[in-house]
């Protein structure tokens, strides 16, 4: 019997075909960034104030500067900084009356401007920005600010539902079909969102994008890890995520060039239409085909891979035939993720680690609050932090295995959060350095959980297992804003204490998982259950059988 990994040793483990396929799927990974973090630019909140009829005309007549206009016509902050009248309240004054002067125009109406009545922003807002965002177009500020939270929550809800549902479809009907379907829906809904006339329609199409986009990203990850040989599996998995980081850098540049949200949304959606050509470029996974007892199709793709790689299959491999003793096709089931003790343990630990990675990754970004007024540069610099994390993984994963670097990265992230609690604000650079160390640690953990998750499940439920477990990071993404902002109201450093506890627990749980370094991907439930023990060559229905007489002598 030969496994797919054995066959790839003959067809090429990472030759021209795999490199071409990796490049194509890496583009898909980079294109996912506008959906995952696009809210930074699509939902940008500029300085704003209530629109008051007559103020613009009075300012023009008097020749005021912007600072003078704000000083004369906009309320200042309330007592002890409570509330925000500058953004959400306006003077109940008729600015069109001719008695108003150009120097302190409110002096004749009240001895002190603080005694003037204030009212809500009945006429909308004025935004100090040359561009536009969904906030400025739909006035998602003040009493409506929660609608921006709902917009981001909707995409995370979509991630959660889509990861589970589409994960099942991908294992049931194939990786390629599901990938193309998610690309098409993502492209169409992205364009429709860009031309949405109302907030409600925009929210609906963003939810649809969430339903398919993350699932498509994960299917691309599964595909590339199933196409390459054992020795290259971890490398392409890491660089697939590095492609996401490159997408962050590109997004910053595109957003800078296109400050209007509709044009930005339309531009970042266009590549998805190009990805539909993958129908002719990316074949179905041979591993999935074999797991579904479609060995003829699998053999055809294997020959195609060998041809693209300039390899010739040995005569023994030309006579491959399916095991005739058992021909039942394996069908994925959610119960397979918890039915047996070891896989159940793997599932629970992986779900917790996905949750932890999302909470710490997004939480540290929110809590750190990058200094500076240039949104685009801040975003660009924060993305650069992720490259050293990938480098450290590449340097350690083959030498130390998966478990120990993964556990250490969680521990470092948790310890950095805890240490930063006791570091004073001055010197500021020291505190930022420690928090960046935590960001690097949790970035490593995020990349490691993707890699190991795919290695712990048998082929016929691998896609389902990855997508179900990774759905917990969507739950983390939904609650993290509330976790950060509500706990900060109690004590500014309290979120960091929570992050530390969560991260340290995650590091300990990782040590309960089996080491996957140097092991072939499990093909059956039994193999996944016995990963801690040395693997024996057993005949499995998802292997390809070779007649002993056809095997050339050693």
From Swiss-Prot:
CDD domains recorded: MFS_SLC22A1_2_3
InterPro entries in UniProt: MFS_dom, MFS_sugar_transport-like, MFS_trans_sf, Orgcat_transp/SVOP, Sugar_transporter_CS
Catalytic activities: (R)-noradrenaline(out) = (R)-noradrenaline(in); (R)-adrenaline(out) = (R)-adrenaline(in); serotonin(out) = serotonin(in); dopamine(out) = dopamine(in)
GO MF terms held by the record: acetylcholine transmembrane transporter activity; monoamine transmembrane transporter activity; neurotransmitter transmembrane transporter activity; organic anion transmembrane transporter activity; organic cation transmembrane transporter activity; prostaglandin transmembrane transporter activity; putrescine transmembrane transporter activity; quaternary ammonium group transmembrane transporter activity
Residue ranges, Cytoplasmic side: 1-21, 171-176, 231-237, 284-347, 398-403, 453-463, 515-554
GO term, biological process aspect, one: monoatomic ion transport
Extracellular-side segments: 43-149, 198-209, 259-262, 369-376, 425-431, 485-493
Spans through the membrane: 22-42, 150-170, 177-197, 210-230, 238-258, 263-283, 348-368, 377-397, 404-424, 432-452, 464-484, 494-514
Positions bearing the site annotation: Involved in recognition of organic cations and participates in structural changes that occur during translocation of organic cations: 450
Residues bearing carbohydrate: 71
Signal peptide: none
Motif range (Proline-rich sequence): 283-287
Keyword Membrane carried by entry: yes
Record text on activity regulation: Tyrosine phosphorylation of the transporter leads to activation of the transport activity. Inhibited by cGMP, most likely through a cGMP-binding protein that interacts with OCT2.
Subcellular location: Basolateral cell membrane; Basal cell membrane; Apical cell membrane
Pfam families per UniProt: Sugar_tr
PTM info: Tyrosine phosphorylated.
Family membership: Belongs to the major facilitator (TC 2.A.1) superfamily. Organic cation transporter (TC 2.A.1.19) family.
Domain notes: Contains one proline-rich sequence (Pro-Glu-Ser-Pro-Arg) that may be involved in tyrosine-protein kinase YES1 binding and is required for the activation of substrate transport.
Further remarks about this protein from its record: Mediates the renal secretion of many clinically used cationic drugs. Transports drugs such as diabetes treatment medicine metformin and neurotoxins 1-methyl-4-phenylpyridinium (MPP(+)), famotidine, ranitidine, amantadine, acriflavine, amiloride, memantine, cimetidine, cisplatin, oxaliplatin, platinum-based drugs cisplatin and oxaliplatin, 3'-azido-3'-deoxythymidine (AZT) and tetraethylammonium (TEA). Mediates the bidirectional transport of MPP(+). Metformin competitively inhibits OCT1-mediated thiamine uptake, leading to a decrease in hepatic steatosis.
Its biological purpose: Electrogenic voltage-dependent transporter that mediates the transport of a variety of organic cations such as endogenous bioactive amines, cationic drugs and xenobiotics. Functions as a Na(+)-independent, bidirectional uniporter. Cation cellular uptake or release is driven by the electrochemical potential, i.e. membrane potential and concentration gradient. However, may also engage electroneutral cation exchange when saturating concentrations of cation substrates are reached.
Protein name: Solute carrier family 22 member 2
Organism: Sus scrofa (Pig)
Lineage of origin: Eukaryota, Metazoa, Chordata, Craniata, Vertebrata
């Amino acid at each position: 019997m030969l496994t797919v990994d054995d066959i790839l040793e003959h067809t090429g483990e990472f030759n021209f075909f795999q490199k071409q396929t990796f490049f194509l799927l890496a583009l898909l990974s980079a294109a996912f960034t506008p959906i995952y973090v696009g809210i930074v630019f699509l939902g940008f909140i500029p300085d704003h104030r209530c629109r008051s009829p007559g103020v613009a005309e009075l300012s023009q007549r008097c020749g005021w500067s912007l600072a003078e206009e704000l000083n004369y016509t906009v309320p200042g902050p309330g007592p002890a900084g409570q509330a925000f009248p500058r953004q959400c309240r306006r003077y109940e004054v008729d600015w069109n009356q001719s008695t108003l002067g150009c120097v302190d125009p409110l002096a004749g109406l009240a001895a002190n401007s603080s005694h003037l009545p204030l009212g809500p922003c009945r006429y909308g807002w004025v935004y100090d920005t040359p561009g536009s965002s969904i906030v400025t177009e739909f006035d998602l500020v003040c009493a409506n600010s929660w609608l921006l939270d709902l917009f981001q929550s909707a995409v995370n809800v979509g991630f959660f539902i889509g990861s589970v549902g589409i994960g099942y479809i991908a294992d049931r009907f194939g990786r390629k079909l599901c990938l193309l379907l998610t690309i098409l829906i993502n492209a169409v809904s992205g364009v429709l969102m860009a031309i949405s006339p109302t907030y409600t329609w925009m929210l609906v199409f963003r939810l649809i994008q969430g339903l398919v986009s993350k699932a498509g990203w994960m299917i691309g990850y599964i595909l590339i890890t199933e196409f390459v040989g054992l020795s290259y599996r971890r490398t392409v998995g890491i660089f697939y995520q590095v492609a996401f980081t490159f997408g962050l850098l590109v997004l910053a540049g595109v957003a800078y060039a296109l400050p209007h949200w509709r044009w930005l949304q339309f531009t970042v959606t266009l590549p998805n239409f190009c990805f539909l050509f993958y129908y002719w470029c990316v074949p179905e996974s041979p591993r999935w085909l074999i797991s579904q007892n479609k060995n003829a199709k699998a053999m055809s793709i294997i020959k195609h891979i060998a041809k693209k790689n300039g390899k010739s299959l040995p005569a023994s491999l030309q006579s491959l035939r399916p095991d005739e003793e058992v021909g039942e096709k394996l069908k994925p089931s959610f119960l397979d993720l918890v039915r047996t003790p070891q896989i159940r343990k793997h599932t629970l630990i992986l779900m917790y680690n996905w949750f932890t990675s999302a909470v710490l990754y997004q939480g540290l970004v929110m809590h750190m609050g990058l200094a500076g007024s240039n949104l685009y540069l801040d975003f660009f610099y924060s993305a650069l932090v992720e490259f050293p994390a990938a480098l450290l993984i590449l340097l350690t994963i083959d030498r130390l295995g998966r478990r120990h670097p993964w556990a250490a990265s969680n521990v470092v992230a948790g310890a950095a959060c805890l240490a930063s609690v006791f570091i004073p604000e001055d010197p500021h650079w020291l505190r930022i350095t420690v928090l960046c160390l935590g960001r690097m640690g949790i970035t490593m953990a995020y990349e490691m959980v993707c890699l190991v998750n795919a290695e712990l499940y048998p082929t016929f439920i691998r896609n389902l297992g990855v997508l179900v477990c990774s759905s917990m990071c969507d739950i983390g993404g939904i609650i993290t804003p509330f976790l950060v902002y509500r706990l900060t109201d109690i004590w500014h450093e309290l979120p960091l204490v929570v992050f530390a506890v969560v991260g340290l627990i995650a590091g300990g749980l990782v040590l309960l998982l089996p080491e996957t370094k140097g092991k072939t991907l499990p093909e059956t439930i039994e193999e996944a259950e016995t990963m801690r023990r040395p693997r024996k060559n057993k005949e499995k229905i998802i292997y390809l059988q070779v007649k002993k007489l056809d095997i050339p002598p050693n």
